[in-house]
């Protein structure tokens, strides 16, 4: 057995693809409010573009309402402008240093578009997992060719890699199904 091949590293890299997928899906707008919806927004603050999370606190007081508590009173207008200009179709109402954002219902056409986007994200995650699998299998073949591992070890380890791949792709599919159900629920 050699230390050059590490199944834990393969699994970690595959899990990274799932984590990335979950982050991307979190940014997809559904009918419900989610603080992650505003994560990609940057605010022109203090002469630089800063993530919204660095100038305000985002909370979800109700299922269809986001509350953005701006820390600096002078930044309220900049935060409001950034949210309006974000192409998310959101319209904040200002109350002092707090912005309240109602999340409107999604129409059926928009829901279907979001499902398509979710499928693209999931496919990208599957491709990433397959790339990790290919890298692992290539390394195993190289180790076997260099006589660093026996053919029995090669077969056993390749089954481990395939099992990890199958489990990870199954997790991607489950994550996608959950998000799709969330998007399509009215």
Curated annotation (Swiss-Prot):
Q: Which UniProt keywords apply?
A: Cytoplasm, Protein biosynthesis
Biological process (GO) annotations held by this record are: cytoplasmic translational termination
Q: Where does it localize?
A: Cytoplasm
Q: Chief subcellular site?
A: cytoplasm
Keyword Cytoplasm assigned to the entry: answer is yes
Asked if Protein biosynthesis is a keyword of the record, the answer is: yes
GO CC annotation: cytosol
Q: Which GO terms describe its molecular function?
A: ribosomal large subunit binding
Free-text function comment from the UniProt entry = Responsible for the release of ribosomes from messenger RNA at the termination of protein biosynthesis. May increase the efficiency of translation by recycling ribosomes from one round of translation to another.
Q: Which family does it belong to?
A: Belongs to the RRF family.
Protein name as catalogued: Ribosome-recycling factor
């Amino acid at each position: 057995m050699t230390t050059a091949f590490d199944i834990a590293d393969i699994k970690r890299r595959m899990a990274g693809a799932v984590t990335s997928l979950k982050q991307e899906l979190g940014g997809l707008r559904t009918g419900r409010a989610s603080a992650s919806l505003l994560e990609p927004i940057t605010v022109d603050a203090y002469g630089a573009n800063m993530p919204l999370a660095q100038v305000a606190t985002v909370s979800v007081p109700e299922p269809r309402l986001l509350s953005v508590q701006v820390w600096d009173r002078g930044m309220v207008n900049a935060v409001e402008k950034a949210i309006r200009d974000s192409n998310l179709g959101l319209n904040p109402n200002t109350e002092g240093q707090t912005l309240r954002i109602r999340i409107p219902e999604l129409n059926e056409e928009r829901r279907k578009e979001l499902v398509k986007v979710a499928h693209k994200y999931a496919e990208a995650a599957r491709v990433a997992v397959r790339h990790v699998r290919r890298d692992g299998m290539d390394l195993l073949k190289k180790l076997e060719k260099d006589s660093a591992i026996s053919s029995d070890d090669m077969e056993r380890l390749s089954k481990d890699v395939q099992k990890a791949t199958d489990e990870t792709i199954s997790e991607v599919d489950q994550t996608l199904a959950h998000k799709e159900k969330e998007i399509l629920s009215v």
